[in-house]
From Swiss-Prot:
Species this chain originates from: Synechococcus sp. (strain JA-2-3B'a(2-13)) (Cyanobacteria bacterium Yellowstone B-Prime)
One term of GO molecular function: phosphoribosylanthranilate isomerase activity
UniProt family annotation: Belongs to the TrpF family.
Designated gene of the protein: trpF
Record HAMAP family: PRAI
NCBIfam families linked to this entry: PRK01222.1-4 (NF002298)
Pathway field: Amino-acid biosynthesis; L-tryptophan biosynthesis; L-tryptophan from chorismate: step 3/5
Entry keyword Glycoprotein: no
Protein name: N-(5'-phosphoribosyl)anthranilate isomerase
C-alpha cells in the first residue's frame, strides 16, 4: 500500500514510551498543555523524553503558547518536532522556524465545516505538515470523536491540501483501515484509541494497530517529511 507515518500521542510514562518506540512507530507525542488530561510537565519531560532510544520522532504538542516558551521546551527536552494545536498564526509558525532550524512543525486544524480546510494554504510556507482533527467545543484533542471520512475525502479532492498531512480524530485499531479506505493521508495520529484511560497507553492496542496496518501492506515511515526550503522562509 505504501508508507504511512504513525504517531502515538499523549504519552505520559517512560516505560510505555520505550515499549511503543520499540514496536516501530514513527513518532511519540507529549502534551505540553497544562490542565489537560495527558499533560507532561517540563521537569518530567526533560528527565527522560530526550534520551529515548532509536530514530523515533519526539513531538511536543502546544496550544496557543508563546513561541519563546515553545522554543525553550524544545531546547530543554530535546524534541525533534512541534505540533501547534491552537490558533497559532502563520507568523508564529514562521518565527518558530527561524528560532528552531531543523525542528519540524505540524499545524493542527480542527475540522468542523468545509471552510476550515481553506486556511491550510495560509500555512503552506511555514510548516512541514498539517494534522486534521475532529472539532470539539471544549477539547482541542484526544476527544475520541471521528471525522466524517467520506465527506473529508470529498472536500480534500475539491480543496487539495498543500502539504503532507496526518489524520487524527477517534482512530483506533478497529476503524483505522476503514478510514484509510476513504482517505490518503501521509500518516495517522492516535491517542484515546490506544488507551485504557487518558495518558495510560495500552501496548497491546498499539501492537494490534501495527498488525492491522501490516496486514494490508502498509510500511511504517521512519521519520517526518524533510524540511523544505519553502517552509524555512
Amino acid at each position: 500500500m505504501g508508507r504511512l507515518f504513525v504517531k502515538i500521542c499523549g504519552i505520559t510514562r517512560q516505560d510505555q514510551a520505550e515499549a511503543i518506540a520499540a514496536l516501530g512507530v514513527s513518532a511519540l507525542g507529549f502534551i505540553a498543555v497544562p490542565n489537560t488530561p495527558r499533560y507532561l510537565p517540563l521537569s518530567e519531560m526533560a528527565r527522560w523524553v530526550g534520551s529515548l532510544p532509536g530514530p523515533v520522532e519526539k513531538v511536543g504538542v502546544f496550544l496557543d503558547q508563546d513561541p519563546r516558551a515553545i522554543a525553550a521546551w524544545v531546547e530543554t527536552v530535546g524534541l525533534t518536532a512541534v505540533q501547534l494545536h491552537g490558533q497559532e498564526s502563520p507568523q508564529d509558525c514562521q518565527q518558530l522556524g527561524e528560532w528552531l532550524p531543523g525542528i519540524r512543525r505540524i499545524k493542527a486544524l480542527r475540522v468542523r465545516q468545509p471552510q476550515d480546510l481553506e486556511v491550510a494554504n495560509l500555512y503552506r510556507d511555514c510548516v512541514e505538515m498539517l494534522l486534521l482533527d475532529a472539532y470539539h467545543p471544549q477539547q482541542a484533542g484526544g476527544t475520541g470523536r471521528t471525522l466524517n471520512w467520506p465527506e473529508l475525502a470529498r472536500l480534500s479532492r475539491e480543496r487539495a491540501l498543500p502539504l503532507p498531512w496526518l489524520l487524527a480524530g477517534g482512530l483506533n485499531p478497529d476503524n483505522v483501515l476503514q478510514a484509510l479506505s476513504h482517505l490518503q493521508p501521509s500518516g495517522i495520529d492516535l491517542s484515546s484509541g490506544v488507551e485504557r484511560r487518558p495518558g495510560d497507553k495500552d501496548i497491546d492496542k498499539v501492537r494490534h494497530l501495527l498488525q492491522q496496518l501490516g496486514s494490508q501492506g502498509w510500511e511504517i515511515a521512519p521519520t517526518l517529511p524533510p524540511i523544505t526550503p519553502s517552509a524555512t522562509g
